[in-house]
């Protein structure tokens, strides 16, 4: 359209109560409460739940706006309105979603990529060559959720999500921690049967870790993996820690292998519990040399006599932020925003 017509149309829209955000020869971007649309273009705004595939390849539904008997979904007919000679119609905005890339970024510092660098650093290749890939092993992770990143699809990794009480949105991992940790698991055991128990979380903290762990136990897995804990340096155990201690012991007595993080500089609990496998961290430099990570914890427990942490080690970065392993996370998640390359 000619500039004069665009300007005249924008002024008419403003006069009718619309906010005009941008003007151009093809379209004018506007916004207003639903009742303004319904008044100017005699119609009703309705909602429709439409099946979609979000960026994580997760089938779900999204709420779209439209009008009854629309010739095209989301099109408001301008005929019969004061704008009938100025615009062809109104196209209602639709929700769009971030699409993650299968290819990781390439930061200009020494780092490891999943799965190959982790597999090599942990020396898992000989096991894979023998056909030991986690097939038939049921692992439950208790964490912030699992986002179906295209990385997992491209490598054939499969997982499912179970919500703990209070957790919502099984297709999302708003924090990103659980999704990233699962990539480490798949690097070592690509054929493992993964279930993620999404615990209710607030920022970087799990709100109901006891309930989430109990949910994991109820699924009767072979292994429960938890990369979290709190700082318990000296006895006595807090009331919370005593409850957690009891349910961890119960899980082990049921024949479940329980793995907990040794901590990131603190005296992690349940990571120091005597019944768990406590996982610490070593740093592998670019020449392949290994050294104890100054980011991961190592200590002798003051609560459980003769208990030294950790029992085993994975690969972990160094202080100050341990930015070391390139992991897939949900775009826009807390980990993506604060730790992204």
Q: Predicted regions span which residues?
A:
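Protease zymogen maturation seam
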Residues: 54-55, 62-135, 237
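Loop/turn elements at helix/coil->beta-strand transitions in domains of secreted/extracellular proteins
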Residues: 16-19, 135-139, 158, 190-195, ...
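Acidic-leg catalytic submotif of subtilisin-like serine proteases
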Residues: 117-167, 260, 312
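Extracellular S/T/G-rich loop segment that most often corresponds to the catalytic His/Ser-adjacent loop
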Residues: 143, 271-341
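Active-site alpha-helical elements of protease catalytic centers
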Residues: 137, 142, 155-156, 163-198, ...
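Substrate-binding/access-modulating region of protease and related hydrolase catalytic domains
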Residues: 180, 199-276, 341
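Inhibitory N-terminal propeptides of secreted protease zymogens
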Residues: 1-94
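Active-site-proximal beta-strand/loop segments in catalytic clefts of secreted hydrolases
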Residues: 23, 31-33, 142-145, 197-202, ...
């Amino acid at each position: 359209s000619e500039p004069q017509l665009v300007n005249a149309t924008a002024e008419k829209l403003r006069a009718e109560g619309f906010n005009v955000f941008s003007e151009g020869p093809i379209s004018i971007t506007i916004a207003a409460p639903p009742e303004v649309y319904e008044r100017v273009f005699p119609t009703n705004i309705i909602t429709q739940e439409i099946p979609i595939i979000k960026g994580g390849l997760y089938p779900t539904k999204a709420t779209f706006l439209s009008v009854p008997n629309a010739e095209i979904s989301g099109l408001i007919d301008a005929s019969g309105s004061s704008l009938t000679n100025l615009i062809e119609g109104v196209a209602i905005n639709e929700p769009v979603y971030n699409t993650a890339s299968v290819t990781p970024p390439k930061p200009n510092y020494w780092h490891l990529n999943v799965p190959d660098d982790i597999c090599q650093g942990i020396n898992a290749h000989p096991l894979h060559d023998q056909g030991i890939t986690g097939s038939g092993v049921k692992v439950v992770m208790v964490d912030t959720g699992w986002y179906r990143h295209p990385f997992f699809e491209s490598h054939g990794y499969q997982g499912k999500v179970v919500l703990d009480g209070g957790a919502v949105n099984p297709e999302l991992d708003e924090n990103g921690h659980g999704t990233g940790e699962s990539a480490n698991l798949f690097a070592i055991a690509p054929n493992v049967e993964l279930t993620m128990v999404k615990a209710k979380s607030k920022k970087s903290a799990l709100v109901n870790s006891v309930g989430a762990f109990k949910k994991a136990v109820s699924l009767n897995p072979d292994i429960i993996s938890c990369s979290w804990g709190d700082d318990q340096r000296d006895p006595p155990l807090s009331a919370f820690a005593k409850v957690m201690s009891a349910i961890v012991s119960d899980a082990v007595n049921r024949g479940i292998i329980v793995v907990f993080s040794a901590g990131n500089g603190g005296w992690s609990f349940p990571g120091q519990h005597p019944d768990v496998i406590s996982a610490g961290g070593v740093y592998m430099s670019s020449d392949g040399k290994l050294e104890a990570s100054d980011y991961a914890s190592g200590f002798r427990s003051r609560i459980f006599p003769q208990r030294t942490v950790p029992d085993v080690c994975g690969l972990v970065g160094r202080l100050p932020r341990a930015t070391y392993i390139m992991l897939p996370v949900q775009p826009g998640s807390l980990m993506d925003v604060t730790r992204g390359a």
